[in-house]
């Protein structure tokens, strides 16, 4: 189930340019930006066409990591049609070809976890600094509804090299290589519970959870329930973001609608009904949380600042708002990671 929707591609460049240039040369991003005139058609001037052309040039030159990054933007922001799904498949192909050159230990495997009375399979990536002992803790990590485990490789790589822990990287239900499972609050959490259980068997038993954007919703859940030993919430929606009457920016209404499993743009009533189930107020009213770090930028257009401030004053919880930056502090990401990395190390390892 998927759908396309009216979306000005230049709006995506406005919002995501800092993220695009984290993994690709500025001049290449600028060239694609100048060439793109429409979002969905797979033809010259189309988003997927122009990004895929850049990716193909890198692939032909043997620059597989850059090709994977470019194909990642080709399939952005949602697997709404066949050209986007093709771009994802090509991204995975190029990423696997690039893996032998990564400066980290890397393994791609498929795990089977309990899901809704049966089982579900999903690809995961394990990443660690070279020579990391087998008995190190494990940190689950994911992006959100539109930026997934392979897209964020550069960030994961830096974290793995800085943190004496093994990363277990995955895509949320409804996204990336897990789009065969619709995003629901409990179903998505059940998948993550299975990953946590697996993670406890492959290291010293200690498990952290680092969620970015919608991934932060799920890391807030694991943190508030105390089901992991350290939880990082970066730009995560928890309560006000799911309230009736909220607005959307930069195409997020269609991105979220696809992740939730709709086959056409949901009506306001349909979306608000789906959102109501995500509200974490019942968990926020409890006092069962483990150690938590909650971070975001003050100028987030997607997640109200209240969804960060609501954690202030909680036991074993640190809150950091980074000024003059937006969703997930993307334009000041180094500052965010300078808080997150040592906190994870101190909390999981001491």
Label every model-predicted segment.
Residues 51, 87-131:
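N-terminal cap/lid segment of alpha/beta-hydrolase-fold proteins
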Residues 221-273:
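Hydrolase active-site cap/lid region
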Residues 287-288, 294-296:
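Short beta-strand/loop motif that positions the catalytic acidic residue
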Residues 301-307:
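Conserved alpha/beta-hydrolase "acid-adjacent" motif
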């Amino acid at each position: 189930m998927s759908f396309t929707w009216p979306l000005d591609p230049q709006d995506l460049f406005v919002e995501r340019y800092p993220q695009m240039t984290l993994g690709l040369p500025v001049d290449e991003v600028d060239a694609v930006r100048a060439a793109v005139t429409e979002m969905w058609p797979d033809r010259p001037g189309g988003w997927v066409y122009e990004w895929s052309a850049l990716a193909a040039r890198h692939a032909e030159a043997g620059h597989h990591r850059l090709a994977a990054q470019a194909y990642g933007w080709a399939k952005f922001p949602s697997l709404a049609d066949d050209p986007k799904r093709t771009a994802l498949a090509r991204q995975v192909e190029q990423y696997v070809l690039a893996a032998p050159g990564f400066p980290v230990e890397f393994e791609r495997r498929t795990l089977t976890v309990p899901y809704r009375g049966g089982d579900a399979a999903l690809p995961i990536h394990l990443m660690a600094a070279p020579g990391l002992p087998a008995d190190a803790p494990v940190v689950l990590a994911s992006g959100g509804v539109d930026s997934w485990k392979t897209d964020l490789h550069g960030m994961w790589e830096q974290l793995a090299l800085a943190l004496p822990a093994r990363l277990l990287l995955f895509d949320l239900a409804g996204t990336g290589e897990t789009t065969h499972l619709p995003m629901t609050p409990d179903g998505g959490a059940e998948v993550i519970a299975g990953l946590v259980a697996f993670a406890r068997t492959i290291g010293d038993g200690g498990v952290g959870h680092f969620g970015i954007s919608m991934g932060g919703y799920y890391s807030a859940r694991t943190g508030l329930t105390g089901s992991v030993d350290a939880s990082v919430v970066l730009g995560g929606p928890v309560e006000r973001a799911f309230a009736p009457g909220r607005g959307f920016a930069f195409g997020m209404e269609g991105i979220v609608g696809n992740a939730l499993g709709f086959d056409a743009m949901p009506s306001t009533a349909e979306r608000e009904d789906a959102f109501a189930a995500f509200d974490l107020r019942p968990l926020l009213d409890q006092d069962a949380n483990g150690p938590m770090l909650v971070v975001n930028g003050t100028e987030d257009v997607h997640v109200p600042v209240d969804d960060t401030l609501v954690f202030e004053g909680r036991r074993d919880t640190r809150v950091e708002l980074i000024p003059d930056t937006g969703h997930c502090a993307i334009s000041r990401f180094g500052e965010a990671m300078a808080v997150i990395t040592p906190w994870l190390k101190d909390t999981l390892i001491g």
